[in-house]
Amino acid sequence: MDDRRPLLRLAKKNREISGIWKTIWPDWLSRVAKGASMSQSERAEFEPIPPFQGDVRYILLLTLVATLGGLLFGYDTAVIAGAIDYMVEKFSLSATMKGWVTSNILLGCAAGAILAGPLSDLLGRRRLLLITAVLFAVSAIGTAIPANLTQFVFFRILGGLAVGAAALVAPIYVAEIAPAHLRGRLVSLQQIAIISGMVVVAVVNWFIALQGDHTWNVHWGWRWMFGSETLPAILFLFCLGLVPESPRWLIKQGRTDEALKVLNRTSGSARAAWEIADIQRTIAEETGRIDELLRPGYRKILIIAIILAILQQVTGINAIIYYTPTIFRSSGSTDIMALAWTILTQAVNLTFTLVAIAVVDRLGRRPLLLLTSVAMAVSLTLLGWAFHAKMSSTWVGIFVQCYLASFAIGMGPVVWVVLAEIFPTRTRG
């Protein structure tokens, strides 16, 4: 008797294939028929991605110009560290007023960050960065020559507006000007630029303090410290006049021809049209609403994000950054040595931020946050004990550097990475 089981299995397989083909065939025909009527942005989803042929040096130049905003962010926030003790003597500030003069910039930062999003959509990324450059320059001049403390506070808050806006808009501009395969590395330059600004201003403050004795610094030195920011602010303003607007913003405004000119240079002519179609499709799919974050599925993520952001700011980093010279003067250092310690502290901050960028993907976000949080707690405890036991400034310096290194490799940069990753794409903005 013949074994017909192989033939039966083959017949069954043919019926299955036939059934699948009957299901696919009408859909495929409709796609082909629709192809002629597809928009450019719809075709982009199915077409192969053309090769990248952009000018990398030009992209890097645009990135460096934008990240000057980050450098000014770091410069403007950290300049107070070298000046505040001289201002205490100049204006006879109480401890409460010293804290207010040091921290009032944060009011401007908050307002600037809130306003920057809507304003950058309305005016454009480049135009808003131009405004921040002007604010940085005006703030630098105003804080250098105030007639009284009220004027100083006003111009300091004005600088805070620029800091908050630059913190948001500069990385957005870089993200929108850079091709996808370079975007992550180029956006990470913003964090490096911020800390580089802190290093630069620490060196500038130290150099200015060397130009005279203590009395000269009380009357004039701190003014030059604030006024020195005018130079990088004017450089930022000049360079922004040479860069184009973000192609994404241009496309959103219907100025596709202008966007094409930019993309021809940043992505290459072969890829520019595909980039425009892809951006148009992405803009059309941006349907996320802020109230979605309050839904049960997102609520836990939102709470975690808020707690992480708060913890990042209340772990003592701002006290260390703003009062580094004060900390070392309190431990027995001279004015000049306290400012020299500040340079070392910011250099450690920059070095370990670079380490964090190198290891965050290999070691993972959670282990880095947990381990460095423990290290920060231990370092702060030892720092407090050093003052209690009246240890030398060398021990104080060691514990401060340990704290900064722990923050710079963990809580500082990694929190921003986590916040960028935990939200679904549709609600991320």
Per-segment meaning from a language model:
Residues 266-268:
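Short helix/loop segments within enzyme catalytic domains
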Residues 13:
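Catalytic cores and adjacent flexible loops of soluble metabolic enzymes
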Residues 21, 25-28:
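Tryptophan (W) side chains
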Residues 32, 39-264, 281-429:
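Alpha-helical transmembrane bundle of multi-pass membrane proteins
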Residues 272-281:
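Short, well-structured alpha-helical segments
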Residues 7-10, 29:
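Leucine-biased recognition of intrinsically disordered, low-complexity hydrophobic segments
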